[in-house]
Amino acid sequence: MKIVADENLAFTDYFFSEFGDIQHKAGRTLTHTDVQDAEALLVRSVTAVNESLIQNTALKYVGSATIGTDHLDIQALEKHGITWANAAGCNAQAVAEYVITALLHLDASLLEQQEKFTLGIVGLGNVGKRLVYMAQLLGWKVIGFDPYVQLDSIENVSFQALLQQANAVSIHVPLTKKGEHATYHLFDEKAFAALQPNTILINSARGPVVKEAALIEDIQRTQRKVVLDVFEHEPVISEELLNMLALATPHIAGYSLEGKARGTQMIYEAFCQKFGYEINKRFETQLPACEDYFSGHDLKAVLKQKLSQIYDIAQDDANIRACVKEGKVEQKAFDLLRKNYPLRREWAAHGGPQA
């Protein structure tokens, strides 16, 4: 069996080598010719799996080691009888930890504020639920908005109420362009007008959920602290926007070693179910041990003293800013940052909590 895999996927050889010949390719530039005689295709969100890519191929299975599916033309896949799978929730823990890290980097005093600090979470799916848990461990008040999900552990509010009440807003929705609750440009001029000027905004979901032109106008007006891991016109990012952001990172919020490995395992399991193979491999056997920071220690004390050692978000911010050339970060530089990213470990690997 020929298997084509994005070169940036983790542990593909470990999980898939026994099934056939694996060809590693750059996901963003994958062509019909690359996959024409492949039976399985393993991708990330940078690959648009659409009619032009999959028509007249030998493909029987497409696995995307990602939370989202907006890069998959599911209608086309089903038309051609191609089984597909994604990895919903694979890196949810890493994204939740990213948000906590970003907030504490911007204001370490949040560790002491307890319920004086209100975190508003837009989207209460896999990531949102884990972020609720982690934020409540720190004593923060959490409010949430999701038209499809209500959580008993928090105050569920309207979108407008969340914008008006939260001290920080973190976005965790898929990108959708149709329907009553479409998320494309959910954060537009009207939404920014409702936000309090000193409310922190974090987007680690999908870039086009935030209308970039409206965001730039808002920051110019309010000097708001904004953290972006995703960008509307990604992978090209303007220097103008970068210079306005409190923190910027190259779409790596979910890039923990555990998250990447978990994503590959999930599409491996779906692959085995499709082709009738026994599921007998676990990613945990491939992970190295790392230093225990948390066991026997107070959570807040550890975060106060060791946060930058667990995850140095300032370095990621510096790295993307160093890639600016002629007024922007270009695709090649952006993709290299992601390809060469030194995968961090989740808190649990250091003996810490996990939602």
Swiss-Prot record:
Any single Pfam family the record assigns to this protein: DUF3410
Residues reported in the UniProt entry to bind substrate: S45, T66, Y255
EC code(s) of this entry: 1.1.1.290
Binding, NAD(+): D146, D229, G254
Active site: R206, E234, H251 (proton donor)
Protein's cellular compartments: Cytoplasm
GO BP, sorted A to Z: 'de novo' pyridoxal 5'-phosphate biosynthetic process; pyridoxine biosynthetic process
The entry's keywords: Cytoplasm, NAD, Oxidoreductase, Pyridoxine biosynthesis
Reactions catalysed according to its record: 4-phospho-D-erythronate + NAD(+) = (R)-3-hydroxy-2-oxo-4-phosphooxybutanoate + NADH + H(+)
Listed CDD domains: ErythrP_dh
Molecular function terms from GO: 4-phosphoerythronate dehydrogenase activity; NAD binding; protein dimerization activity
GO CC, alphabetical: cytosol
Primary location group: cytoplasm
Metabolic or biological pathway, per its Swiss-Prot or TrEMBL entry: Cofactor biosynthesis; pyridoxine 5'-phosphate biosynthesis; pyridoxine 5'-phosphate from D-erythrose 4-phosphate: step 2/5
HAMAP family referenced in this protein's UniProt entry, alphabetically: PdxB
Quaternary structure note: Homodimer.
Role noted for this protein: Catalyzes the oxidation of erythronate-4-phosphate to 3-hydroxy-2-oxo-4-phosphonooxybutanoate.
Sequence similarity: Belongs to the D-isomer specific 2-hydroxyacid dehydrogenase family. PdxB subfamily.
Protein name: Erythronate-4-phosphate dehydrogenase
